[in-house]
């Protein structure tokens, strides 16, 4: 029987078969646009929309997804890294790009050059962003991250307030928001 034949195949055959399997995900960009329209209908036109396109839009193609969402009027895009921000830089058409994964002080000038908002919990990053902003004649925008239980990036609430005050008093830096990632 076919089942018996498969049962008797050597382990190497299974490993070869599994290693050649490449999952594929297809996205219907028209359905994406429709779904965005439904979200906008539910929340109203006064609510801004930030679309997360990190991890190559979760494997669906960040550039194509970003292009379609720009054409639908999405206000901002979220990515995890500056490399991801750079991949969508030419297609985001002036929309805000927020780097949620944090950056190191060494990456600050690049973040400013890419015109990205940065989520941070670091005074050193705020200082480096200020230096990059002043040197380039731009403004760096920061979102202060509060740790609410994920323990990846973020400050205790009192420390976040302190960092927000520091950012507000720093030339070249504009604190945009305080944010968190709620642990479930």
Where are the regions a protein language model picked out?
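Intrinsically disordered, low-complexity peptide-like regions
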Residues: 5-6, 179
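Short, positively charged and aromatic/hydrophobic N-terminal segments
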Residues: 7-8, 14
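Intrinsic disorder/low-complexity detector
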Residues: 9-10, 37
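Ala/Thr-enriched low-complexity intrinsically disordered regions
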Residues: 1-3, 12
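Generic cytosolic/nucleocytoplasmic N-terminal low-complexity/intrinsically disordered segments
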Residues: 6-7, 34, 53
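Glycine-rich phosphate/diphosphate-binding loops that line cofactor/substrate pockets in enzymes
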Residues: 36-47, 138
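Active-site-proximal beta-alpha core segment in soluble small-molecule metabolic enzymes
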Residues: 19, 23-26, 31, 47-184
């Amino acid at each position: 029987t076919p089942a018996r034949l498969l049962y008797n195949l050597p382990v190497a055959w299974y490993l070869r078969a599994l290693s050649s399997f490449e999952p594929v995900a297809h996205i219907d960009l028209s359905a994406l646009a429709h779904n965005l329209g439904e979200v906008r209908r539910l929340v109203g036109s006064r609510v801004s929309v930030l679309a997360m396109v990190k991890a190559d839009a979760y494997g669906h193609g960040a550039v194509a997804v970003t292009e379609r969402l720009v054409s639908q009027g999405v206000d901002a895009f979220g990515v995890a890294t500056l490399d991801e921000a750079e991949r969508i830089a030419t297609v985001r058409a002036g929309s805000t790009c927020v780097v949620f994964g944090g950056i190191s002080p060494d990456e600050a000038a690049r973040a400013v050059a890419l015109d990205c908002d940065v989520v941070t919990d670091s005074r050193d990053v705020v200082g480096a962003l200020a230096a990059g902003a002043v040197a380039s004649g731009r403004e760096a925008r920061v979102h202060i991250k509060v740790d609410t239980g994920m323990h990846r990036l973020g400050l205790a609430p009192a420390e976040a307030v302190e960092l927000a005050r520091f950012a507000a008093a720093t030339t070249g830096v504009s604190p945009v928001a305080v944010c968190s990632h709620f642990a479930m």
